[in-house]
Amino acid sequence: MKAVKKYFITGGAGFIGAHRVNTILDSTDAQVTVYDNFSTGRRWAYGDRISDSRLSIIEADVRDLPRLTEAMKGHDTVYHFAANSDIASAAKQPDVDFWNGTYLTHNVLEAMRINGVKRIFFTSGSGVYGEIGEEPVPEDYEHMVPISTYGASKLASETLISAYCHMFDMKGTVCRFANVVGPHQTHGVAYDFINRLAKQPEKLVIYGDGRQSKPYIDVFDILSAFDLLERDQRESYNYFNVGSDDHITVTEIADIIVEKMGLKNVVYDYTGGARGWKADVPIYRLDTKKIRATGWANRMNSRQAVEASVEAMLDDLKNGRYK
């Protein structure tokens, strides 16, 4: 009889984490333990699955290594989503991405080592590359110079995972995502715009000049990448860019939201400058040939992903889920 797979998901109540929990419960007979401090997480994101006997929820902090280690016992696969989600906050709190980023990854890896857990998936991002401009950047780019503490923390976490995988016979998969959007977002440009316009529908403050352009990816497209990458990995450590091959500007996102909210004559108040916030990378493109060679493909382009996510967030707003 085949053993039931047991997943341990840090940050499993957050935006991407909750969707991963839901897809695992919906498509497998596996058991899932969510380990989350619920600083931004939401139980309602699980829907009816909240009562599924295969789902266990532990409200605790990944910084608590003894408790984390005890909770992880008996699991075989870790998804590590727990991290600081407010990239701009580091300008006022410079250590946030260490304590809520790199340090968390260290603790997860230590808990895995102590418990003999051998498989980890980690969500990284384009911030590891730094300023790369409009040329699509491949995974083996030689000049990775992050300009934000968020990007530095993600890169440090990647190298820690690589080291633990090689030293302690683990297998690690890192996904460097484009900007992820979808239902139940807890942060991001579109999320911020919707909340600002709900409070002040006649004017929208837009950080920067609105010409920042980036690739966006629907959350369900990245979940399909996880499903594919779970099936087989011979290397101790591997990493992939996962995103759309096109892009969309901040002003275009604002236009989509204004239209879908049915607003008229909204004044855009640009704060000026190329960056939306300190250490923002205003333009980047990802080379996604490596992940596409596995057979993965995104269903939605950047614009479609943003449009779908805006519709879902407006539905959440209508139903009182966002305050």
Task: Say what each PLM segment does.
Residues M1-V180:
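N-terminal Rossmann-like NAD(P)+-binding domain of SDR-like oxidoreductases, especially those catalyzing
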Residues H19, W44-A45, E70, K92, ...:
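Generic recognition of short, well-ordered alpha-helical segments
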Residues I50, A82, M112, L197-P201, ...:
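Hydrophobic aliphatic residues
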Residues A60, K199-K323:
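C-terminal substrate-binding subdomain of Rossmann-fold SDR/epimerase-dehydratase oxidoreductases
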Residues P66-T69, A88, D95, H106, ...:
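Residues in well-ordered alpha-helical elements
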Residues E70-A71, A111, R196, A225, ...:
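CheY-like receiver
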Residues E135-P136, H187-R196:
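A glycine/serine/threonine-rich, flexible loop-to-helix segment
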Residues A156, L160, Y164, F193, ...:
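Hydrophobic alpha-helix immediately C-terminal to the catalytic Tyr-X-X-X-Lys motif of short-chain
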